[in-house]
């Protein structure tokens, strides 16, 4: 066997082994790894939460999104929302203002600088002990914020993610036929969280 053939075989089999580890070995390792119990310490009162939403021309979604966050099963006095309008020109700002809830703050970012800058701008003024990020077209189940915050009762928890389900307007999670990739991704997250 020539050196070139040997090198090609090593690259091929090494690459195949790497792909196999990513899709089979890593999940299997997570599954077999023993779960570790978390030490939870309940706070005297729920921590303050700031929900941050970056929006660019989200006129169609922004009102439903903000109202969905305001309707969370979480103490109203411990929840506020910051919407950063990233140079929107479609009336997004007016819709947020019309909501008229003192827990909602609108920041205008001009000129448009992108989602990352919008999120950073919101973080500069956020007052919550816990920050929850939301896309401008995302809706949460009523207990989402409460469940996210509950995970922080364990001092070793540094961040928490939720499960993402892509739905068309009016569609339910049952009827969405959520993609295999998202099911796989959510399954891995669950294993990593044990």
Model-derived features: positions:
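N-terminal membrane-anchoring/stem segments of glycan-assembly enzymes
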Residues: 1-43, 184
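Short, acidic, metal-binding catalytic loop of nucleotide-sugar glycosyltransferases
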Residues: 67-78
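Conserved donor NDP-sugar-binding/catalytic core segment of glycosyltransferases
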Residues: 139-176
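Short aromatic/hydrophobic "clamp" motif used to bind/position activated sugar donors
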Residues: 131
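Acidic helix N-cap motif at the loop->helix transition within catalytic regions
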Residues: 61-64, 78, 89-98, 106, ...
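Cell-envelope/extracellular polymer assembly enzymes that use nucleotide-activated donors
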Residues: 47-50, 80
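Glycine-rich, basic loop-to-helix element that forms the pyrophosphate-binding segment
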Residues: 109-126, 183
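A conserved acidic beta->alpha catalytic loop
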Residues: 85-94, 111, 138
